[in-house]
Amino acid sequence: MAIIRSVIAATALLGAAVNAQVVGTPFGFGAGTTGGGDATPAAPADTAELTEWLADDEPRVILIDKEFNFLGDECTDCECCIPDSNTCGDAGQNAIEVGIGWCGDYPTTTCTYDNAGLDGLDVGPNKSIVGVGDAGVIRGKGLRIHGTENVIVQNIHITELNPQYIWGGDAISLDGADKVWIDHVKISLVGRQMFVTGYESSGSVTFSNNELDGTTDWSASCDGHHYWTILALGENDKVTFANNYIHTTSGRAPKVGAPSFWHVYNNYWSDNTGHAFDVEESGTNVFIEGNVFEDINSAYNDDGTGAIFAVDSGSEATCSSVLGRTCVANSLTNSEYTAVADESVLSAFPADEEGDITILPVDQVAAYVLANAGVGKLSASGSTSGSSSSIAPSSSVPVIPTSTPLVYPTFTPPAVETNAIQKEHEVSTPAVPTPTPVPSSVGSHGSTAGSSHPPAFSRTSFES
């Protein structure tokens, strides 16, 4: 009987492993990413084994079948500063002094934070990191995909990276990476960027079906909305950003600031008290179509010098001569919008590299994204690709095509700006909404006890 039970248990584990393989295939600029390929799926026993498996050079399919909690190594009575943006005390964000001069002349204070968040988990080549059901959580650390290639991250929740502190940690950081697919990931409660691309170019990245949840008790804009959402400052990056849900934010959603190309379609932006797009630098091209903007204070920051083609009802036909199809207009409800249709973006669009995509009619986008973006929803959507670049008819059921492209840019940090936060928070914001409950354990803005010290800090994500 014991033997039979063992066989049944082993069979169940094998079935779970098979079912936890990557679902669907990457589309867009990230097409062709295979991750760990046919490696046998395996679940690490603990955080130490997860850390080891992620960083090695072996092709792996790593199952995240539970919560991996990296919290517990606190830095107490450590140096922080109070930036000008924090006008609301404990409801705002102070900043960790990380040794790059960012704090400048801001008033100093002491604070308690968790050391784990400051440096992400290194990810080596040929990895698939796949959550099982809705159980896959990485708490306290992000993923650092630097100088590597062929990585898939799917169906996990990354959360609680010192959300009360600027410089508390980045959820997903790319730098000099290629062939990366980030899919069905939820990110919440981070101190700094939810997604950032770093100094060296990360060529082909797909970012699809993800939920970026900015609900927070500690807001740099003092309104319960997370400011640091996406920062992309790398040159020559090609990004297809599709089917994502970005909500309860107040800025940098995204900020794109170096010559690169983003194709942004079928995303749902909701409840942004500041600005969504900040296209900062000349040579940057952002093509925005078929998205829903709902309750967005400003869809675009007017200060940037990059090129934007945002499709509205007056520019839908413009794509025909360049792309051979009609563009899909964006939808805006209770959102500030200035028409921007720089046709140089279409001329620069590397459609042959993006490959085949399917774009939903805009009236289907919000419902589709809410049903499919984030963790535990793989069976609902599948991440698949279509056979041709096309517009799905409005009567069709909103199913993601079998291979739709999504890619992320790489970032090159600008010079440190002491007053960067203050400068980017000039938009007035409403009263603070009811925030998300405090997670398992967080530090305080001020502290007078303890003797721990922060780890050596390596700034690899961004500096402004």
Swiss-Prot record:
Belongs to the polysaccharide lyase 1 family. The keyword Cell inner membrane does not apply. Pectinolytic enzymes consist of four classes of enzymes: pectin lyase, polygalacturonase, pectin methylesterase and rhamnogalacturonase. Among pectinolytic enzymes, pectin lyase is the most important in depolymerization of pectin, since it cleaves internal glycosidic bonds of highly methylated pectins. Its main location: secreted. It comes from Emericella nidulans (strain FGSC A4 / ATCC 38163 / CBS 112.46 / NRRL 194 / M139) (Aspergillus nidulans). The lineage of its organism: Eukaryota, Fungi, Dikarya, Ascomycota, Pezizomycotina. One of its GO terms (molecular function) is pectate lyase activity. It catalyses: Eliminative cleavage of (1->4)-alpha-D-galacturonan methyl ester to give oligosaccharides with 4-deoxy-6-O-methyl-alpha-D-galact-4-enuronosyl groups at their non-reducing ends. Residues 439-448 have a biased composition (Low complexity). It is found in: Secreted. Glycans are attached at residue 126. It holds the Pfam family Pectate_lyase_4. The keyword Nucleus does not apply. This is Probable pectin lyase F. Residues 424-464 are annotated as: Disordered. Its EC number is 4.2.2.10. It is an enzyme of class 4 (lyase). Residues 1-20 form the signal peptide. Keywords: Carbohydrate metabolism, Cell wall biogenesis/degradation, Disulfide bond, Glycoprotein, Lyase, Polysaccharide degradation, Secreted, Signal. InterPro entries: Pec_lyase (IPR002022), Pectin_lyas_fold (IPR012334), Pectin_lyase_fold/virulence (IPR011050), PEL (IPR045032). It comes from the Eukaryota. Disulfide bonds join 80-103, 319-327. One of its GO terms (biological process) is cell wall organization. The active site is at residue 252. GO terms for cellular component: extracellular region.
